[in-house]
């Protein structure tokens, strides 16, 4: 399981020309589910994401979490994080989980984030989405469990 976590001033998802979700200050998380990933791995990843201290405190040091700053969370499923371009120029996505299981874990990620008191929104699983963001910092982390 892989996640790209970006600290943002705002982020949004548009599908078929319609706004489906948007957040203000917080995290945009791109989530990639690999074959065989478990709920335990998802729990570990979400716990880590929500505990990250990547917002500045009063001295400018990265020391505050998403909850500390009252931030919001936008989670977008992105199977292309599991792409392998080590051979040739066209990536293989054979390492990505099958859609039904990936969707199940993605939806659990939304619930886990919301259950921790964080206003959480998502994209539309499997849709062609237009994701916009204003990266803050920029601060971008790649996490893998």
Curated annotation (Swiss-Prot):
Domain-level remarks: A Gly-cisPro motif from one monomer fits into the active site of the other monomer to allow specific chiral rejection of L-amino acids.
Gene expressing this chain: dtd
GO molecular function: D-tyrosyl-tRNA(Tyr) deacylase activity; Gly-tRNA(Ala) deacylase activity; Ser(Gly)-tRNA(Ala) hydrolase activity; tRNA binding
Job of this protein: An aminoacyl-tRNA editing enzyme that deacylates mischarged D-aminoacyl-tRNAs. Also deacylates mischarged glycyl-tRNA(Ala), protecting cells against glycine mischarging by AlaRS. Acts via tRNA-based rather than protein-based catalysis; rejects L-amino acids rather than detecting D-amino acids in the active site. By recycling D-aminoacyl-tRNA to D-amino acids and free tRNA molecules, this enzyme counteracts the toxicity associated with the formation of D-aminoacyl-tRNA entities in vivo and helps enforce protein L-homochirality.
SUPFAM superfamilies xrefs: DTD-like (SSF69500)
EC number annotated for this UniProt entry: 3.1.1.96
Biological process, per Gene Ontology: D-amino acid catabolic process
GO cellular component: cytoplasm
Keyword Amino-acid biosynthesis: no
Gene3D superfamilies referenced in this protein's UniProt entry, alphabetically: D-tyrosyl-tRNA(Tyr) deacylase (3.50.80.10)
Motif (Gly-cisPro motif, important for rejection of L-amino acids): 137-138
Key words, A-Z: Cytoplasm, Hydrolase, RNA-binding, tRNA-binding
Subunit-structure text: Homodimer.
Catalytic activity: glycyl-tRNA(Ala) + H2O = tRNA(Ala) + glycine + H(+); a D-aminoacyl-tRNA + H2O = a tRNA + a D-alpha-amino acid + H(+)
Pfam assignment, any one: Tyr_Deacylase
Domain of life: Bacteria
InterPro entries, per database record: Daa-tRNA_deacyls_DTD, DTD-like_sf
Descriptive protein name: D-aminoacyl-tRNA deacylase
Primary localization: cytoplasm
Cytoplasm among keywords: yes
Localization annotation: Cytoplasm
UniProt xrefs under PANTHER family: D-AMINOACYL-TRNA DEACYLASE 1, D-TYROSYL-TRNA TYR DEACYLASE
